[in-house]
Amino acid sequence: MVKIKAAVCHEFGTPLKIETIDLREPITGEVEVTLGAVAVCHSDISFADGDWGGELPAVYGHEAAGFISKIGDSVKGFEIGDRVVVTLIKSCGYCNNCSEGNPTICEDNSNAEPPILSMKGNTIQQVMNCGAFAEKVVVDQSQIVKLNNDLNFATASLLACGVITGIGAVVNAAKLRPGQDVVVIGAGGVGLNAIQGARIAGARRIVAVDTNGDKLTIAKEFGATDGVLATEKSPWRIAKSLVGRGADIVFVTVGNSSVYDIAPRYLGYGGKVVMVGMPKTGDKSVYEPVMMAAVSQGMIGSKMGDVIIKRDIPWIVDLYEQGRLKLDELVSKTWTLDQINEAIADTKLGSAKRNVIVFEAKQAS
């Protein structure tokens, strides 16, 4: 066991507490990663607020980067000192979905011995297989991707969730074709990356929709051709007038069920809604199936951009190195672990692209 600092949730909807906890050694197939940075994602906030349930106490955080500091047995392709991105995508490699190239929806829910414990020896939940609001994590080797460049950890951490979720939703889930028109509802961290993905994939028009005018301005910097305030009366009509028709694809990147109610109104004939943002457990949306079926419209879900991390993350990094993709600009502000509750409060205001917690991780030379 090694002692580490972590931000622990003991009660939903209350500030996280910085505590010293125990982290066990990595076992077969696992690695210990000393973290350099972890981003604050709205999913972490939803869990901490109790929107999706779960057991407590718990450590959240799933969008991280650092270097490997210990390696368990049977780990292949990684060495101590390797700089890596740490994701929540734990895959067995053998179930039907993994065998078909869909590791984000791996069917194997079995878990190893819990890696984190309180100082009294009680189990602490490692949420989303990461628990990265901490100085170190122990994760499965399937969750990490090696970084072969000197990308700083704050920027690299975003590759673990927001970037791959947005870009992957466009390229992998929607399979956008050059010349298609898209609407992206929500111009936050994931939405901006959906916009970047649409630009890279060759979309003709990219319409960003958000309640915040400043975020629409930022969306255009990331590749949106147009912006529509969601507070306007019938914003879907404005979007259609800008495009000249309904959209081929609408990406919903916010976790609000009322947004899902109106998302199909942006569609053209044969279009589809891609569900990316996740509302609270139990929230419902209402549709008119006859209207969608009559014009061959549809809806699909996209978890973590349907990515294969060892394929997609290196590709995305290469685009960044070529200057074709913005990553550094996604970091709104950096914070320390002791400031995590302030970072969460700032994220809840809705103006940040991504707040990132940085650690003083010192890698042996």
For the regions a language model picked out, list residue spans one by one.
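Glycine-rich cofactor phosphate-binding loops and adjacent beta1-alpha1 units
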Residues: 174-178, 190, 201, 213-298, ...
